[in-house]
């Protein structure tokens, strides 16, 4: 049997091994062809592994690390002090050929910087972008990028994001000729910042991209586009606002606290909402789509939410598997070469 091998930064995130280790075992139980290289402090990880099914432990290898990248470290500082950290070792396992992808819930800036340093960028890509597939009203998925890797983006970067997002939509969501839109404050061509308007003009000239113009944030979940492109500042705020709202709605719809002042009204809402509608709300649970692709790199790197629980981190591991199986980095490189946009 040919295994798919992933390297996991076991020490990253708000909860570290308390979440990443149980999630690793859950992923191994779900995917028989998966092997995991768990990078972290053996003294912390081994006690957590005690009691788990030995059958799954056979497909898990513990790779020791001496330190961890702190969440509050600035990217430059984190990179400078990254030697022997769980994050860097996990990335170097890809470089050495021992792993096919990496998953980390650690410091986003450090992960991007170290990935560029260790994994390298695809020719023709200036900066990697954090990318996620979000469910929408029409029961499909919208690829949205960038979600926070790049606060400022020029028009060239936005065009590159559009190309990468199109490939991801085709390969992961299975959409033929995906629609691409730019996130903006209005649908009129005159709206928005200069970089957005310039990117729009360029996208209109690329026949292989199905560019449909601007989309406003209130249409994100309406299924009006398959790929939504924006800078990391707008994307991160949009995503977190949506996730916060959905967590609030889901918590209200699933509350069982009789003393809650809203309980009576919530119960009435539950009775009014049919099962189909309720299921659509449940599908928007952020835990179900945890794991952002750091696209633009020569290998797959997945960034999990720092506060992810066990099931959410398991989802991030699954996302990494999908990307490896569908050869996303290779497909992006092929698309860039075909479009003659690579840098010489």
Curated annotation (Swiss-Prot):
InterPro entries: FA_synthesis, Phospholipid_synth_PlsX-like. It is found in: Cytoplasm. The gene is plsX. Pathway: Lipid metabolism; phospholipid metabolism. Belongs to the PlsX family. GO terms for cellular component: cytoplasm. Its EC number is 2.3.1.274. Keywords: Cytoplasm, Lipid biosynthesis, Lipid metabolism, Phospholipid biosynthesis, Phospholipid metabolism, Transferase. One of its GO terms (biological process) is phospholipid biosynthetic process. It comes from the Bacteria. Homodimer. Probably interacts with PlsY. PANTHER family: FATTY ACID/PHOSPHOLIPID SYNTHESIS PROTEIN PLSX, PHOSPHATE ACYLTRANSFERASE. It comes from Blochmanniella floridana. This is Phosphate acyltransferase. It holds the Pfam family FA_synthesis. Catalyzes the reversible formation of acyl-phosphate (acyl-PO(4)) from acyl-[acyl-carrier-protein] (acyl-ACP). This enzyme utilizes acyl-ACP as fatty acyl donor, but not acyl-CoA. The keyword DNA repair does not apply.
């Amino acid at each position: 049997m040919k295994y798919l091998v992933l390297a996991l930064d076991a020490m990253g995130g708000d909860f570290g091994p308390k979440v990443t280790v149980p999630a690793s075992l859950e992923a191994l139980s779900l995917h028989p062809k998966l092997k995991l290289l768990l990078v972290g402090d053996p003294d912390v990880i081994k006690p957590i592994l005690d009691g788990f099914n030995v059958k799954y432990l056979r497909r898990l290898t513990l790779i020791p690390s001496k330190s961890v990248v702190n969440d509050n470290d600035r990217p430059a500082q984190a990179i400078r002090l990254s030697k022997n950290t769980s994050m860097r070792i996990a990335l170097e396992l890809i470089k050495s050929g021992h792993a096919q992808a990496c998953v980390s819930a650690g410091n986003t800036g450090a992960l991007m910087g170290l990935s560029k340093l260790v994994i390298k960028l695809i020719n023709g890509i200036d900066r990697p972008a954090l990318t996620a597939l979000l469910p929408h009203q029409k029961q499909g998925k919208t690829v949205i990028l960038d979600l926070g890797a790049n606060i400022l983006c020029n028009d060239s970067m936005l065009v590159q994001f559009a190309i990468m997002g199109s490939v991801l939509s085709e390969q992961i969501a299975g959409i033929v000729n995906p629609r691409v839109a730019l996130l903006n404050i209005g649908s009129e061509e005159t709206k928005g910042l200069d970089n957005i308007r310039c990117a729009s003009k360029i996208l209109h000239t690329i026949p292989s991209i199905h560019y449909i113009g601007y989309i406003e944030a209130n249409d994100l979940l309406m299924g009006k586009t398959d790929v939504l492109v924006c800078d990391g500042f707008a994307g991160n705020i949009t995503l977190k606002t949506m996730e916060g709202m959905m967590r609030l709605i889901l918590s209200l719809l699933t509350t069982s606290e009789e003393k809650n002042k809203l309980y009576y009204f919530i119960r009435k809402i539950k009775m009014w909402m049919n099962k189909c509608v309720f299921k659509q709300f449940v599908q928007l649970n952020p835990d179900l789509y945890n794991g952002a692709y750091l696209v633009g790199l020569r290998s797959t790197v997945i960034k999990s939410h720092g506060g992810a629980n066990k099931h959410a981190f398991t989802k991030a591991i699954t996302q990494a598997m999908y990307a490896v199986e569908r050869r996303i980095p290779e497909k992006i490189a092929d698309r860039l070469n075909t479009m003659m946009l690579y840098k010489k």
